[in-house]
Each structure stands twice: as structure tokens, then as C-alpha cells.
Design a protein with these regions (language model features):
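Receiver (REC) domain active-site loop signature in two-component systems and cognate sites
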Residues: 55
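Two-component/phosphorelay signaling modules centered on CheY-like receiver
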Residues: 11-29, 97
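Active-site residues of response regulator receiver
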Residues: 52
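Conserved sequence signature across two-component system core domains
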Residues: 7-8, 31, 49
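Acidic catalytic/metal-coordinating carboxylates
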Residues: 32-36, 59-62
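Alpha4 helix (beta4-alpha4-beta5 surface) of REC/receiver domains from two-component response regulators
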Residues: 62, 83-103, 110, 114
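Hydrophobic/aromatic residues positioned on beta-strands within the core alpha/beta folds
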Residues: 79-81
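Short amphipathic alpha-helix used as the core "switch/output" element in two-component signaling
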Residues: 39, 61-73
Length: 122
């Protein structure tokens, strides 16, 4: 069973993603902020980390860099709704910084599962 860590400040979003992934056979852990997520990453060494780019405090770009520094082989899926920025541009930058794939919110469950599978296959 593949393990996934979801780092997002929106608890409802975390619950939805956890449900989708759990239903598809993934073991899921969530973190409501970047620091907690980075700690859990070190403890759990998950197969994939899903990181929201726009979070209060330490934002997702810095989180991706820190995860990549801790483990260059980590699989990372960047997600964002864009906020005040163009989501496509934000996600392109996230991929340049080390995300293996990216996904714009909102998304359909099938799109999430396809992105997760692409990241894990990379």
C-alpha cells in the first residue's frame, strides 16, 4: 500500500483528498501546515507528498524546496487554487522547483488519482 502525506491548511480539503485516496487503497496522513508536514515527512517517509502552494506561514514553494533537500528522491505533487495569482503559472514554477507533477484546484477525483499515479510511476 502506497503512503501519501497531504499538506494543506484547509481541513475540509484534506478530508476530501484523504477519502478519495483511501477509497483507492492509499494510506493517507494529513498535516494542516508546512512545519507539521515537514516533520511528518521526516517521521513517515511517505511515497508521495501532496503540497498546497498557497498556505499561511511557510508557503508551498519553500516547503517543496525543503522536502527536496531532505530527500532528493521524494515524489511531490503541487496543488493550488491560485489565490491572487494565475494558478497555471504558480504550478509551473512549483515544477521548476522540484514538484514531479501539479494539479489545479478544484479538480475531479479521477484527475487527482491520475496525478498521484503519474507521480508514483516517475
Amino acid at each position: 500500500m502506497n503512503s501519501v502525506l497531504v499538506i494543506d491548511d484547509d481541513p475540509v480539503f484534506c478530508n476530501v483528498v484523504e477519502g478519495i485516496l483511501h477509497h483507492d487503497g492509499y494510506a493517507v496522513t494529513t498535516a494542516g501546515d508546512a512545519q507539521t508536514g515537514i516533520s511528518r515527512f521526516g517521521e513517515l517517509n511517505p511515497d508521495l507528498v501532496i503540497v498546497d502552494i498557497l498556505m499561511p506561514g511557510k508557503e508551498g514553494m519553500a516547503t517543496i524546496l525543503e522536502l527536496r533537500e531532505a530527500n532528493p528522491e521524494a515524489r511531490i505533487l503541487a496543488i493550488t487554487g491560485g489565490g491572487n495569482f494565475a494558478a497555471g503559472e504558480v504550478l509551473r514554477i512549483a515544477e521548476l522547483l522540484g514538484a514531479d507533477n501539479s494539479l489545479k484546484k478544484p479538480f475531479e477525483p479521477a484527475a487527482l488519482l491520475a496525478s498521484v499515479k503519474r507521480c508514483l510511476a516517475a
